Amino acid sequence: MKLFIDTANVNEIREAHSWGIICGVTTNPSLIAKEGRDFKEVVNEICSIVDGPISAEVISLKAEGMIEEARDLAKIHKNIVIKIPMTAEGLKAVSVLSKEGIKTNVTLIFSAAQALLAAKAGATYVSPFVGRLDDIGQNGIELIKEIVQIFKNYPDIKTEIIAASIRHPIHVIEAAKAGAHIATVPFKVLEQMTKHALTDVGIERFLKDWEKVPKKS
């Protein structure tokens, strides 16, 4: 499974990229707004750090506006992927953009039916929201499993599944077990994934043992 980082903070992106584990970035208007910087400036800088798919979201709600924004965003860098909301208008936009060779990531997916429609419209990626489904008492990982099964049934579907709205390391592991192609993970969760109490204990023990080794004067 591939790992993307879900943030617009360039310091977090640089750090995670230095670990050699991420191959893409997802952003959204909320994440960009937190940075307090010009949208295109942030996206440009992200593209200079990570040589992989960089998702940038449109804000228009009508297909015509989405298409216009998408064409403009696609000019920023060859790695730009356009995030489109899962609506009927969004599907119209995805259909047009896919024919123009512009990659799309259909976001805010909460059902297998939505994922199937997005794939049929030509989406490069679909992003089912695991955590938000869990928040309302549904099972986000079960949705990933459903979508994976449907896509496997039809080899002509080339759309990749991005497990999104990841809240903790267990979500990442369960998404991997379910067969998601990608998980897009907040930096704090990536940090959590590096840690285990027994690892810390082991390091401390090694250092104490090393101190006991006679040193040549």
UniProtKB/Swiss-Prot annotation:
EC supergroup of this enzyme: transferase
Cross-referenced SUPFAM superfamilies: Aldolase (SSF51569)
Major localization class: cytoplasm
UniProt KW keywords: Cytoplasm, Pentose shunt, Schiff base, Transferase
EC number: 2.2.1.2
Molecular function terms from GO: aldehyde-lyase activity; transaldolase activity
Localization per Swiss-Prot or TrEMBL: Cytoplasm
Catalytic reaction(s) noted: D-sedoheptulose 7-phosphate + D-glyceraldehyde 3-phosphate = D-erythrose 4-phosphate + beta-D-fructose 6-phosphate
GO biological process: carbohydrate metabolic process; pentose-phosphate shunt
Active site positions: 83 (schiff-base intermediate with substrate)
Pathway the protein contributes to: Carbohydrate degradation; pentose phosphate pathway; D-glyceraldehyde 3-phosphate and beta-D-fructose 6-phosphate from D-ribose 5-phosphate and D-xylulose 5-phosphate (non-oxidative stage): step 2/3
InterPro entries the UniProt entry points to: Aldolase_TIM (IPR013785), TAL/FSA (IPR001585), Transaldolase_3B (IPR022999), Transaldolase_3B/F6P_aldolase (IPR004731), Transaldolase_AS (IPR018225), TSA/FSA_arc/bac (IPR033919)
GO cellular component terms listed in the entry, alphabetical order: cytoplasm
Similarity section: Belongs to the transaldolase family. Type 3B subfamily.
Job of this protein: Transaldolase is important for the balance of metabolites in the pentose-phosphate pathway.
Protein name: Probable transaldolase
